[in-house]
């Protein structure tokens, strides 16, 4: 399933959502060289999160291959700042554009009822919850973790809490069969969450390069954090104007 747009208007410009998208794209272009080597591998090595390094499970000085002819040299102790910087690093054009598209579709409505500063704090804490989940699931992993997926998972978890009945125009495809459908948010995002949960349970802890448990942790973190960051006045305004929430 690929969400195209939701049928859920906003009352205010999503300044923070657009700012986060701009920051991720700027990091991809200016820091990661748009995926060109050696900038990509060096950025993943220096700014990505290596669970085993953070947890002290990998011996200092260990070399971890991350790209063609590029290795990460593990330091001890691992730098906690990687929990934050890893949210703004990506592995490919598909990775960064896919993540930013999901944030574009769902982030504006969550920001609309939290307010800008609360939403920014929520997004970052959701990303930290996602990183913590992946580290706990694979504490010995030497594979660098990068991407905004966990933080965006938190946004999607919040969206389900706030707008379960909102329609989401979704491109649904199965083999050669494809169709555009309007699905309720709880169904579209519930399917996404179930897919991450099953993939995390059935795949190795390192997920073949996909941090499934970060997605799960982010989604659940978003559900838990939403009541703490929700602005009741903004929610009431949104509900009065749209009939949703």
Where are the predicted features?
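A detector for small-residue-rich transmembrane helices and their helix-helix packing motifs
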Residues: 1-245
């Amino acid at each position: 399933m690929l969400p195209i747009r939701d049928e859920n208007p906003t009352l205010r410009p999503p300044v923070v959502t657009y700012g986060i998208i701009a920051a991720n794209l700027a990091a991809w272009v200016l820091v990661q060289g748009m995926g060109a080597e050696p900038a990509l591998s060096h950025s993943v090595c220096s700014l990505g999160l290596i669970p085993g390094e953070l947890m002290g499970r990998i011996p200092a000085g260990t070399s971890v291959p991350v790209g063609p002819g590029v290795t990460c040299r593990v330091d001890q102790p691992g730098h906690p700042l990687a929990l934050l910087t890893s949210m703004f690093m990506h592995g490919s054009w598909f990775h960064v554009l896919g993540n930013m598209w999901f944030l574009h579709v769902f982030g504006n409505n969550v920001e609309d009822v939290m307010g800008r500063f609360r939403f920014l704090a929520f997004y970052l804490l959701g990303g930290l919850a996602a990183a913590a989940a992946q580290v706990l699931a694979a504490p010995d992993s030497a594979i660098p973790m990068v991407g905004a997926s966990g933080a965006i998972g938190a946004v999607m978890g919040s969206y389900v809490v706030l707008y379960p009945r909102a329609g989401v125009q979704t491109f649904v495809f199965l083999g050669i069969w494809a169709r555009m459908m309007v699905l309720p948010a709880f169904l579209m995002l519930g399917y996404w969450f179930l897919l991450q949960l099953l993939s995390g349970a059935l795949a190795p802890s390192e997920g073949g390069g996909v941090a499934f448990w970060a997605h799960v942790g982010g989604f659940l973190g978003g559900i838990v954090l939403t009541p703490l960051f929700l602005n009741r006045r903004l929610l009431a305004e949104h509900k009065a104007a749209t009939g949703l929430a």
